[in-house]
């Protein structure tokens, strides 16, 4: 039996490209501020998952401040991240995401 993955992580650029990550399959920018992330392991059913998402640079670039929200989707391998500027307006932002499973 494969070992249960307890953590997932990624850094996503504003265009939806994956800068780096662990156990991430893909990321798609689906609207001005909405990203759909597909993981290699399910976030639901076999596991309970908690998330931490912060706006942050991909490497060394300056980043405009903002906030991100996370949510599960019907597909247990997928989740949604939405990013906003500090006024609450949808905005593309790079972000760091960590998921903790138990």
What are these regions (language model features)?
Residues 1-102:
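Extracellular attachment/recognition segments
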């Amino acid at each position: 039996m494969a070992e249960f993955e307890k953590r997932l992580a990624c850094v996503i650029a504003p265009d939806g490209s994956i800068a780096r990550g662990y156990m991430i399959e893909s990321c798609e920018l689906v609207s001005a501020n909405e990203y759909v992330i597909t993981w290699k392991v399910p976030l639901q059913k076999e596991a309970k998952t908690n998330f931490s998402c912060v706006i942050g640079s991909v490497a060394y670039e300056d980043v405009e401040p903002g906030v991100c929200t996370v949510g599960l989707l019907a597909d247990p391998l997928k989740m949604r991240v939405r990013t906003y500027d500090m006024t609450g307006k949808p905005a593309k932002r790079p972000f760091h995401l960590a998921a903790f499973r138990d």
